[in-house]
Amino acid sequence: MKASFCWERFEALPIVGILRGFPMRLLPGLLAAVRRGGLRTVEITMNTPGAAEQIQEAVQLAGEELTIGAGTVQDLAGLDAALTAGATFIVTPVVNEPVIRRCVERRVPVFPGAFTPTEIQRAWDLGASLVKVFPADVGGPAFIKALKAPLPHVKLLPTGGVDLASLPEYVRAGADAIGIGGPLFDRERIVAEDWPWLEQRCRAFAE
């Protein structure tokens, strides 16, 4: 199936769940728990073994209900592999101009990683749909609020260290979306296939 990014779905619940390094065999149960828990957007990082195959499988398993994207995209080869696999949005760790420009050309939403005001504005000027502020926990919600003062036009996606307790603070600070990895996808629980726990965890973040 050919999936596409749905802004309406994303804006209704602007949380990106970040999957990094989980084996393919866990994907069906994991995605089912995420769906039941109410989350709608999942990023599979390209430094996961077999990432392209996982993205393709995720789109086939859940692409009608979940928005599936690729993270940690570091070059054009990785971008092409992710898009061929069916990723509908792209996240980069840094302001990678060739990747951003290619995404803009192909009308694929791209969320580049940046930290300083100069990097953030540069990513936005290149055509970023959102700018991933990483690592967000270095500055916390106060940093997001400070960035929004001179850069209110830039949509920010703080990522890194955001947990259930701090999420509301980031939203109040002006975050337009939130990226969550480890605090949502606890490795020990997932490897143990504790899907009821994951469903409840996703529901807690979604609410």
Regions found by a protein language model. Name each.
Residues M1-T88, E105, H153-L156, L164-A165, ...:
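Conserved N-terminal beta1-alpha1 strand-loop-helix module at the mouth
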Residues G38, A62, G86, V94, ...:
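Conserved functional loop/turn residues at catalytic and ligand-binding sites
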Residues M46, T72, P93-V95, A114-F115, ...:
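Short secondary-structure boundary segments
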Residues D75-A85, T118-L126, F143, V162-I178:
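Catalytic cores of alpha/beta
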Residues F89, P93-V138:
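Histidine/lysine/aspartate-rich catalytic loop segments that bind and position anionic ligands
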Residues F89, P93-V99, V133-P141, A175-W195:
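Glycine-rich phosphate-binding active-site loops on the catalytic face of alpha/beta enzymes
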Residues V99-C103, Q121-L126, P141-A146, S166-E169, ...:
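Short, charged, surface-exposed secondary-structure boundary motifs
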Residues C103-V104, V110, P141-L151, L156-P158:
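CoA-thioester-processing core
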